[in-house]
From Swiss-Prot:
Record keywords, A-Z: Chaperone, Cytoplasm, Protein transport, Translocation, Transport
Main location: cytoplasm
Keyword Cytoplasm: yes
Gene Ontology terms, MF aspect: unfolded protein binding
Compartment(s): Cytoplasm
Top-rank taxon, per record: Bacteria
Known role: One of the proteins required for the normal export of preproteins out of the cell cytoplasm. It is a molecular chaperone that binds to a subset of precursor proteins, maintaining them in a translocation-competent state. It also specifically binds to its receptor SecA.
GO cellular component entries: cytoplasm
Protein name: Protein-export protein SecB
Organism, scientific name: Shewanella frigidimarina (strain NCIMB 400)
Length: 157
């Protein structure tokens, strides 16, 4: 019986405690002139994630999105969103925890951030903007690979 209780205590657990908007900004630096031009934007998306340990098994993960739309040489709009979540994560190895914080949690947060960006752009009276899905697993794998390459480079230097 004690063995079963011990196994349950070690079983991986993942819980979302809260998802919230930490910060947001929407700017149209060239309005109203930008509305007078033909709409042919170049949209750029920058992503960043970070995490903070709040307690032994509780983490805050912050997904930052910056969307910049340029119409010709002029910036049509700049939208910055920080979507955050508080997650309870227990029973994972260090590698599994790093993956959860760097890929799984951002995957959970992205739909909320994408919706917020779309709403802000719409309220700015620009045409609808639907951000494409992001493969955070691939981005995290690329990040790990870059860190390993940098560590190898330092070791050989």
């Amino acid at each position: 019986m004690a063995e079963v209780a011990n196994n349950e205590a070690q079983a991986p657990q993942f819980n979302i405690q809260r998802i919230y908007t930490k910060d947001l900004s929407f700017e149209t630096p060239n309005s109203p002139a930008v509305f007078q031009k033909e709409w042919n934007p170049e949209v750029k998306l920058d992503l960043d994630t970070r995490s903070n340990k709040l307690s032994d098994d509780t983490y805050e993960v912050i997904l930052s999105l910056t969307v910049t739309a340029k119409n010709g040489e002029d910036t049509a709009f700049l939208c910055e969103v920080q979507q955050a979540g508080i997650f309870s994560i227990v029973g994972l190895t260090e590698q599994q925890l790093a993956h959860s914080l760097g890929a799984y949690c951002p995957n959970v947060l992205f739909p909320y951030a994408r919706e917020l960006v779309g709403n802000l752009v719409g309220r700015g009276t620009f045409p609808q903007l639907n951000l494409a899905p992001v493969n955070f697993d691939a981005l995290f794998a690329q990040y790990v690979q870059q860190r390993q390459a940098a560590a190898t480079e330092e070791a050989t230097a």
